């Protein structure tokens, strides 16, 4: 129910100054009743996505093509309900400004920013959805992670792929590059890759989360 605060515990967008978690704030709280939940923000997401059901997996902040900040949300699933959906690789976002109280204020409507189709790439053998995106400030590029969890016969098949593109190509809507091994083979994660972090100029950290099998 997009008019209810019942899902606040599962659908918060929070912000706090680095190293000061005691100053946490809810982003875009509902102004109608003063409840500290992100109902207003969820309604903006639903309007941008255009579907009653969606799953957000990925959050990044990048410089916009206008010189200010652009906050990005990765969409993994969208459809009518949790059991009637399609996997997508879609990114929506909006430019923002910081308020005097160190919160985020959107200065434009949330809208489609980027999308791509892994099925167009040789070596991608599974339908997958977006599971993470992360900005690399050292090299001005964006990493995207897609993952899959399916069955072939009676056997469960899980894994993921890593993609990269420059910030300029991202703003231009160009296709990402599929990351490969040095010998040209597609890099396919052996577990369900669900998160990525840029540690420094040369290292990435990938998080696995196998929903159906917790044995790594």
Task: Show which residues each predicted segment covers.
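Sequence/structural signature of beta-propeller domains
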Residues: 1-216
């Amino acid at each position: 129910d997009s008019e209810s605060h019942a899902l606040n515990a599962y659908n918060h967008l929070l912000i706090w100054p680095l190293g000061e978690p005691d100053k946490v704030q809810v982003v875009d709280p509902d102004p109608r009743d003063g409840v500290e939940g992100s109902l207003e923000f969820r309604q903006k997401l639903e309007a941008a996505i255009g579907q009653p059901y969606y799953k957000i997996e990925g959050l990044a902040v990048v410089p916009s093509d206008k010189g200010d900040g652009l906050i990005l949300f990765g969409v993994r699933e969208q459809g009518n309900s949790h059991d009637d959906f399609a996997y997508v690789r879609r990114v929506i976002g909006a430019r923002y400004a910081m308020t005097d109280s160190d919160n985020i204020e959107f200065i434009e409507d949330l809208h489609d920013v980027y999308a791509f189709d892994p099925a167009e790439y040789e070596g991608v053998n599974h339908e997958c959805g977006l599971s993470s995106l992360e900005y690399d400030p050292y090299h001005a590029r964006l990493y995207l992670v897609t993952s899959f969890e399916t069955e072939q016969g009676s056997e469960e098949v899980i894994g993921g792929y890593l993609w990269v593109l420059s910030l300029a190509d991202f703003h231009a809507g160009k296709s990402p590059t599929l990351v490969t091994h040095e010998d040209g083979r597609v890099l396919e994660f052996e577990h369900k890759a669900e998160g990525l972090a840029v540690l420094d100029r040369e290292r990435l950290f990938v998080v696995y989360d196998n929903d159906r099998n917790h044995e790594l």
